[in-house]
UniProtKB/Swiss-Prot annotation:
It comes from the Bacteria. GO terms for molecular function: structural constituent of ribosome. GO terms for biological process: translation. InterPro entries: Ribosomal_bL28 (IPR026569), Ribosomal_bL28/bL31-like_sf (IPR034704), Ribosomal_bL28_bact-type (IPR001383), Ribosomal_bL28_sf (IPR037147). This is Large ribosomal subunit protein bL28. Belongs to the bacterial ribosomal protein bL28 family. Residues 1-21 are annotated as: Disordered.
Length: 78
């Protein structure tokens, strides 16, 4: 399963670990992904999404139906 938020599109980025001696080694900064089930009243079923806490706040603000319509418009299956 890919490490991408289904709502915001946030994905891993790369950077460096920096030691006290200023040595740089490659690392990945991973998004804080959570798996969450949402009840969709219009479809009378649960929808499971993999999203970040910011994605959850967006759903709280806009509603699950509006966010699902946006996800489906991008061609993702939910």
């Amino acid at each position: 399963m890919s490490k991408v938020c289904q709502v915001t599109g946030k994905r891993p980025i790369t950077g460096h670990n920096v030691s006290h001696a200023k040595n740089h080694t490659k690392r990945r900064f991973l998004p804080n992904l959570q798996t969450h089930r949402f009840w969709v009243e219009a479809e009378k079923r649960f929808v499971t999404l993999r999203l970040t806490p910011k994605g959850m706040r967006i759903i709280d603000k806009l509603g699950i139906e509006a966010v699902l319509a946006d996800i489906r418009a991008r061609g993702e299956k939910v």
